[in-house]
Regions:
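Aromatic/acidic, Gly/Pro-rich catalytic loop(s) in extracytoplasmic/lumenal soluble domains
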Residues: 507-570
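Membrane-integral, polyisoprenol-dependent glycosyltransferases
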Residues: 2-414, 421-427, 431-434
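Short acidic low-complexity segments
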Residues: 498-509
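Stable alpha-helical elements in mature extracytoplasmic
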Residues: 75, 99, 328, 456-463, ...
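Solvent-exposed loop/turn segments at secondary-structure junctions
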Residues: 170, 372-373, 484-485, 517-520
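Short, hydrophobic beta-strand segments that form beta-sheet elements in well-ordered domains
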Residues: 20, 478-482, 500, 512-514
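Membrane-proximal, lumen/periplasm-facing interface regions of secretory-pathway glyco-
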Residues: 316-317, 416-476, 481-496, 543-568
C-alpha cells in the first residue's frame, strides 16, 4: 500500500509539473529582479539615508525665500477660511479638489487644539507650515521609489531616487503650495499598491490602492488621464511581453523569483479564492467611495459637493481650450531645457527595455512616462507643473538606464560612473540655480518660473509691516485698488481691515496699494493726503509679477481727516 501511495503521489507531482510547464510556455515572463547582491546591504542603506538627507535639505531650506505664486495665494486663501471659519465648499470653478486644504489644515488645527488660537496663527498659518505639505509628499514620493528595489534593481532604484531628489522641477514644485506634488504621490501609490498585490498575492492590497485612487480623484480632475495611461501601459506591457516571450529571460539577480500568472482563475486562487477576492474588492470599493464622498462633501457638511465634483470635467475641458495653450512639442522642449538628464537617460532606458525586455516593470515605467508625456502633449492646455506627472516615471526609467549600462557584458563601473557624474552634476547645478538663485526669473530658459511673483513683492510686504507696526498693528487699514494683487491676501492675512476693491475707491486708510497704471488717478484723487513709499527701483514701484507693478502710498501722519472721503474722478 505504501508503495502504491508513493507511486500515485509521484505521478500526481509529474502531472502537475507538466501542467505548470505548459502554462509557463504560454505566459509572458514578468519576473521581478531581486537585486540585493548588486551592492552590499550597507551601501544600500547609506545610499537611502544620504538621498533622503539631500532631498530634505533641498526642499526644506528657507521655504520663505520664494514669494508665493498667484495660485499659491489663492490656495492659501481657501485654507485660511477652512482653518479659521471651518468653512470649505467645493466649487468646480475653483482650482481643483479639496485634499490639499484638508491636509494643510491638519497642522494649524493641532496647534489650536494644543496651544490655542494664537499658536495656530503664529505657527500653523505660516508660509513654512503650508509649504511643508508638498515637501512631505515630495519626500514620500522618493520613499516610494525605494520600495521598487526588487523590481528595478539596486543601482536603478538608488539612481532614480537621487535623480528625483535633485530634479529642478521636483524640488521647485515640492516647495510650492499647489496640488501637483500630492497628486503624483497618490498616482505612484496606486502603482506600488498594485505591485505589492501582484508580488505578495495579498488581496488586501486592493484597499490602499483604492484609497490612493480616491485621494487622487479628490485632488485634481486630471486623475482620469493618469489612471487611463496606467491601464494602457499595463495592457501594452502584457501584450508586448506575450509577443516577445521567446526573447525574455529571467534576470540573473539572485533571490526569490516572481511567480508566474498562468490565468486569471489561477491568479484569483493564489489571492485566496473568489470569496476572499470579492470581499476585498467590496472593501476597496467602500474605501474609494467613502473617501471620495467625505472630501467632496466637506466631511458631510456640503452634500452638493458630490454632484459638483462631476461638473468639474466640463469646466476643465472649457478652461483647457482658452488659456495656457502651447504647441504640441512644448513639453519635450521644456524637459530638454530643465530636465535634460532625465529625458535623455529615460529615452535610453526605454530603448534598452524595449530591445531587451527582461524587466517587465521597467517596460511599464517607460510606457507610463512617455505615455503621460504624449497624453498631456496632445492637450492644448500646458503648464510646467504638469510635467511633474511624467518626471517621476522618467526618473524610474532613467535609473534603469544606468543599471543597464552597468550590466553591459562586463561590469562597466567606469562608464556608469561617468554617466552618473555628468547627469547628476548637470541636474544639481540646474536645481540650485532654479530654486535658490533664479526662482523668479521670467526668462524662457527657466520654464518652471511661470508668471511667478517677483521677489520685489516681499519688499512691499516688509514696508506694509513696517508701517503697520508704526500705526495700529493688525488693525491698520489698507485699501487695495489694484486689479492685480494675488498673492497679497496671504501675506496680509493678519490685517483685519483690508479692502480689495480692484478699482479706484475712496479711502482714508493709512495705506493704499495701487497699480502703477493708476498712478495719475491716485495722485489726482488723493492730492496731498498720501505720500508714496518708494522701492529701490527707479520708478519707486514694487514688481508683483512680469508686467504688473504696484505702488504703495502711506497717509501722512499729521493727517487724521474727519471729513467724508474725497470723491473719485473718473
Amino acid at each position: 500500500m505504501a508503495n502504491t501511495a508513493s507511486t500515485k503521489s509521484t505521478r500526481s507531482k509529474k502531472a502537475h509539473a507538466r501542467h505548470a510547464a505548459a502554462a509557463a510556455k504560454n505566459a509572458p515572463h514578468v519576473e521581478a529582479p531581486a537585486p540585493s547582491s548588486d551592492l552590499p546591504e550597507r551601501v544600500w542603506l547609506i545610499g537611502v539615508v544620504m538621498i533622503f538627507v539631500i532631498a530634505a535639505a533641498l526642499r526644506m531650506y528657507d521655504l520663505n525665500l520664494v514669494p508665493l505664486h498667484h495660485d499659491e495665494g489663492v490656495n492659501g486663501n481657501f485654507l485660511m477660511r477652512l482653518v479659521r471659519e471651518g468653512a470649505y465648499t467645493y466649487d468646480p470653478e475653483n482650482y481643483h479638489g479639496p485634499t490639499l486644504y484638508y491636509f494643510a489644515a491638519f497642522w494649524p488645527w493641532v496647534m489650536r487644539a494644543l496651544f490655542g488660537k494664537a499658536s495656530m496663527e503664529n505657527y500653523g498659518l505660516t508660509t513654512v507650515a503650508i509649504r511643508m505639505v508638498p515637501v512631505l509628499f515630495g519626500l514620500g514620493t522618493i520613499g516610494l521609489i525605494f520600495t521598487l528595489r526588487r523590481w528595478l534593481g539596486t543601482i536603478a532604484t538608488l539612481t532614480a531616487a537621487l535623480l528625483l531628489a535633485i530634479s529642478p522641477g521636483a524640488v521647485y514644485l515640492s516647495r510650492y503650495f499647489i496640488h501637483e506634488t500630492q497628486f503624483v504621490f497618490f498616482t505612484f501609490a496606486i502603482v506600488v499598491s498594485c505591485l505589492y498585490l501582484y508580488e505578495h498575492r495579498n488581496p488586501f492590497c486592493l484597499i490602499p490602492a483604492a484609497a490612493s485612487g480616491a485621494l487622487l480623484f479628490a485632488t485634481k480632475e486630471t486623475a482620469f488621464i493618469s489612471v487611463g495611461v496606467l491601464i494602457i501601459a499595463l495592457a501594452v506591457t502584457f501584450v508586448y511581453l506575450r509577443l516577445v516571450r521567446g526573447k525574455v529571460r529571467p534576470p540573473k539577480a539572485k533571490g526569490r523569483p516572481q511567480p508566474e500568472v498562468w490565468s486569471l482563475g489561477d491568479f484569483v486562487n493564489e489571492l485566496g479564492g473568489p470569496v476572499m477576492v470579492s470581499l476585498c474588492a467590496v472593501l476597496a470599493a467602500i474605501t474609494f467611495a467613502g473617501l471620495y464622498y467625505l472630501f467632496y462633501t466637506s466631511f458631510t457638511l456640503n452634500p452638493k459637493g458630490l454632484s459638483d465634483s462631476f461638473q468639474t470635467f466640463a469646466v476643465w475641458k472649457k478652461t483647457s481650450s482658452v488659456a495656457h495653450v502651447h504647441p504640441i512639442y512644448t513639453y519635450i522642449r521644456w524637459l530638454l531645457q530643465r530636465e535634460g538628464a532625465l529625458l535623455v537617460l529615460g529615452a535610453f532606458g526605454a530603448l534598452f527595455v524595449v530591445l531587451k525586455p527582461t524587466n517587465a516593470f521597467a517596460l511599464f515605467a517607460a510606457l507610463w512616462a512617455f505615455g503621460l508625456t504624449a497624453a498631456y502633449s496632445l492637450i492644448g492646455y500646458k503648464t510646467p507643473w504638469l510635467m511633474l506627472n511624467f518626471v517621476v516615471p522618467l526618473a524610474l526609467i532613467a535609473g534603469y538606464a544606468v543599471q543597464a549600462i552597468f550590466e553591459l557584458e562586463a561590469r562597466q563601473w567606469r562608464v556608469t560612473g561617468v554617466v552618473l557624474i555628468v547627469a547628476l552634476s548637470f541636474t544639481a547645478y540646474q536645481s540650485i540655480d532654479l530654486n535658490f538663485i533664479n526662482y523668479d526669473n521670467d526668462d524662457t530658459r527657466y520654464v518652471y518660473v511661470y508668471a511667478h511673483t517677483k521677489r520685489g513683492m516681499l519688499d512691499l510686504v516688509k514696508e506694509v509691516d513696517r508701517i503697520g507696526k508704526e500705526r495700529t498693528g493688525g488693525q491698520t487699514g489698507i485699501t487695495i485698488v489694484s486689479p492685480d494683487y494675488w498673492p497679497l491676501p496671504w501675506y496680509l492675512r493678519n490685517y483685519s481691515r483690508v479692502g480689495y476693491y480692484g478699482r479706484m475707491a475712496p479711502s482714508t486708510e493709512p495705506m493704499i496699494i495701487a497699480n502703477s497704471t493708476q498712478q495719475p488717478e491716485v495722485e489726482a484723487n488723493f492730492r496731498d493726503m498720501y505720500q508714496q513709499v518708494r522701492s529701490k527701483e527707479g520708478d519707486g514701484a514694487f514688481e508683483l509679477r512680469p508686467g504688473v507693478r504696484l505702488l504703495l502710498y502711506e497717509r501722512r501722519k499729521d493727517l487724521f481727516p474727519t471729513e467724508a472721503p474725497p470723491s473719485i474722478k473718473r
